[in-house]
């Protein structure tokens, strides 16, 4: 994107309140015009003094303009500040909402810390641009437009010096922006690397402390910061050179203007007041050119930050759902996979040709070795990804034709990592349903076997669980997650390794709550511990993205295939168990 496109898009965020922007812009135009009158008034005063005329009327007008200028400037600055702060807050909230509503696949692709860093830095950059636009950029542009013809009307010869100075400023600015474009982009990349390293290290501080990696991480950060400074310093050097050249050019230009003015006065072609007024114009023009140079520096620095932000917003818009999707309502829980296939970009992994059917209220266990595609299958069910081939039907409706919000409303998930927020226990349970009453929250906790340990804590339901639930035990965190799913009361339940991180005793307590939660719900269980799949109506064994075996627990145990081999390897299937299962199957057949 060009600098003009970047700047214009940044100003587009102000269009939410066009009337307010127009009022501030109009006031800026008036202030710019008043600023041009001051050198003229000063010149008139000097002429009056040199000609022994009356100066009081001119001084009175000048004083009135000055007082108006001060009051108007304060009001404009106050209005611009308040409006810029309000827009920053609104854009931050809008962008945050847009980012968190994106599919998980979008977050996996971009990285959470990268999106967060891009968002925060861009919002601050936008705020600075808005503030400077309403305070200086517009008034500078108006002043330059008015100054040039006014100066030409006073004296063409001295004006040509100022025009040459303006051309020189523009040339220096363009040269420096061209020289620093790649460097500024590199600076932004290094900022992202520093932020990502800090976020990653702090998020995993327990692991780093355990392995005595704190010194190494700090040293790595110092290396990243050094690389950042190494990239930043050449950019700063170029702008320092630009400022020095601009200062030198403006000083020489003022000397030339004064020399020309002195010559014209001595030859009777201009009055002293005219020269003084023109030098006032020259000083004003130079200050505006300095502001223009600062603006060029600011927009050049903002380019890399805002380009990333615009890409983020555009990708979020591209990932947004199309119009016309229906809501999934009155779900009974009948789920069918029809020849479903999906492949991850760059890895070739995924699932292929998956077909099975789950009746409403049944439990299906998806098992298999690591990397078999179990979690991918569940992600496809929840439309984290969309199938590249085949389709997934819920109550006969293709999930790609319904809104993600209504689909998620129909599915409750209990993850291996409970995923608790650093808030109270009540707030964490309320994630399941925001409008739930306290009675409903307590009932969900009772159903999840969590009520006793919650009430045993000094803060009860107001107890803050800490970051990622760090103040609770593993079993307590899982029961809070189960209570959340109970409160959601969705017709489809997903248990994603929900008990694999628990010890046997804690797992038994949590399993009772899970069994209660599964009742009358279509349930998908992803499990490594095969003890958790005994009660499943259907077992789907996957390997390398394909369904290898499928059937009931007893059926697959007796088939002596991959599933039975896993059971035997885990000590869960022996000859006695085979005979018992065989008698059970024969009894059902009879």
UniProtKB/Swiss-Prot annotation:
Residue ranges crossing the lipid bilayer per the database entry: 22-42, 55-75, 136-156, 158-178, 248-268, 275-295
Membrane topology designation: Multi-pass membrane protein
Every ABC transmembrane type-1 domain range: 21-301
Family as reported in the entry's similarity comment: Belongs to the ABC transporter superfamily. Beta-(1-->2)glucan exporter (TC 3.A.1.108.1) family.
General function of this protein: Involved in beta-(1-->2)glucan export. Transmembrane domains (TMD) form a pore in the inner membrane and the ATP-binding domain (NBD) is responsible for energy generation.
Pfam families (UniProt xref): ABC_membrane, ABC_tran
Catalytic activities: [(1->2)-beta-D-glucosyl](n)(in) + ATP + H2O = [(1->2)-beta-D-glucosyl](n)(out) + ADP + phosphate + H(+)
Entry's EC annotation: 7.5.2.3
Gene Ontology annotations for the cellular component aspect, listed alphabetically: plasma membrane
Major place of residence: membrane
Domain ABC transporter: 335-569
Protein name: Beta-(1-->2)glucan export ATP-binding/permease protein NdvA
Compartment annotation: Cell inner membrane
Classification via PROSITE patterns: ABC_TM1F, ABC_TRANSPORTER_1, ABC_TRANSPORTER_2, NDVA
Key words, A-Z: ATP-binding, Cell inner membrane, Cell membrane, Membrane, Nucleotide-binding, Sugar transport, Translocase, Transmembrane, Transmembrane helix, Transport
Record has Glycoprotein as a keyword: no
GO molecular function annotations of the record: ABC-type beta-glucan transporter activity; ATP binding; ATP hydrolysis activity; ATPase-coupled lipid transmembrane transporter activity
Keyword DNA damage attached: no
Domain remark text: In NdvA the ATP-binding domain (NBD) and the transmembrane domain (TMD) are fused.
Enzyme class: translocase
Subunit structure: Homodimer.
Organism field: Mesorhizobium japonicum (strain LMG 29417 / CECT 9101 / MAFF 303099)
Residues where ATP binds: 368-375
């Amino acid at each position: 994107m060009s600098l003009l496109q970047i700047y214009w898009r940044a100003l587009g965020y102000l269009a939410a309140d066009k009337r307010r922007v127009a009022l501030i812009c109009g006031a800026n135009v008036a202030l710019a015009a008043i600023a041009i009158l001051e050198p003229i008034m000063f010149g008139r005063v000097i002429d009056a003094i040199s000609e022994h005329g009356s100066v009081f009327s001119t001084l009175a007008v000048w004083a009135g303009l000055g007082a108006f200028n001060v009051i108007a400037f304060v009001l404009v600055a106050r209005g611009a500040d308040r409006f810029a702060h309000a827009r920053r807050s609104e854009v931050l909230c809008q962008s945050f909402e847009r980012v968190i509503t994106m599919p998980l696949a979008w977050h996996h692709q971009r990285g959470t810390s990268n999106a967060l860093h891009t968002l925060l830095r861009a919002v601050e950059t936008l705020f600075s641009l808005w503030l400077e636009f309403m305070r200086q950029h517009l008034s500078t542009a108006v002043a330059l437009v008015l100054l040039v013809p006014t100066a030409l009307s006073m004296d063409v010869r001295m004006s040509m010096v100022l025009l040459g100075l303006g051309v020189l400023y523009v040339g220096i600015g363009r040269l420096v922006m061209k020289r620093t474009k790649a460097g500024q982009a590199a600076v932004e990349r290094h900022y992202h690397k520093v932020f990502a390293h800090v976020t990653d290290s702090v998020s995993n501080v327990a692991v780093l402390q355990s392995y005595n990696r704190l010194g190494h991480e700090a040293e790595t950060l110092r290396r990243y910061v050094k690389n950042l400074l190494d990239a930043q310093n050449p950019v700063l050097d170029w702008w320092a050179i630009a400022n020095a050249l601009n200062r030198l050019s403006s000083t020489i230009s003022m000397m030339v203007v004064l020399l020309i003015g002195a010559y014209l006065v001595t030859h009777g072609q201009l009055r002293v007041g005219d020269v003084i007024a023109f030098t006032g114009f020259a000083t004003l023009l130079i200050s505006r050119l300095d502001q223009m140079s600062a603006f060029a520096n600011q927009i050049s620095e903002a380019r890399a930050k805002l380009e990333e932000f615009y890409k983020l917003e555009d990708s979020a818009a591209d990932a947004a759902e199309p119009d016309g999707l229906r809501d999934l309502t009155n779900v009974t829980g009948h789920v069918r996979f029809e020849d479903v296939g999906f492949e991850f970009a760059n890895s070739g992994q995924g699932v292929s040709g998956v077909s099975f059917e789950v009746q409403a209220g049944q439990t299906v266990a998806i098992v298999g070795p690591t990397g078999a595609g179990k979690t991918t299958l569940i992600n496809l069910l929840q439309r984290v990804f969309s199938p590249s081939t085949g389709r997934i039907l819920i109550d006969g409706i293709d999930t790609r034709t319904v809104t993600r919000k209504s689909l998620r409303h129909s599915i409750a998930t209990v993850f291996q990592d409970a995923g608790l927020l650093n808030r109270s226990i009540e707030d964490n349970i309320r994630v399941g349903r925001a409008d739930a009453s306290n009675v409903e929250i307590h009932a969900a906790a009772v159903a999840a076997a969590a009520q006793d340990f919650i009430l045993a804590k000094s803060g009860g339901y107001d107890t803050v669980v800490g970051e990622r639930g760090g103040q609770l035990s593993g079993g307590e965190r899982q029961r809070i997650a189960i209570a959340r799913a109970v409160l959601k009361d969705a017709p489809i339940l997903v248990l994603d390794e929900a008990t694999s991180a628990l010890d046997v005793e804690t797992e038994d307590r949590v399993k009772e709550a899970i069994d209660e939660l599964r009742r009358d719900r279509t349930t998908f269980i992803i499990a490594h511990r095969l003890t958790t799949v005994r009660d499943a109506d259907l077992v789907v064994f996957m390997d390398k993205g394909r369904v290898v075996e499928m059937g009931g627990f007893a059926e697959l145990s007796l088939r002596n295939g991959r599933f039975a081999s896993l059971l035997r390897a885990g000590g869960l299937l022996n000859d006695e168990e085979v005979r018992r299962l065989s008698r059970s199957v024969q009894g059902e057949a009879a």
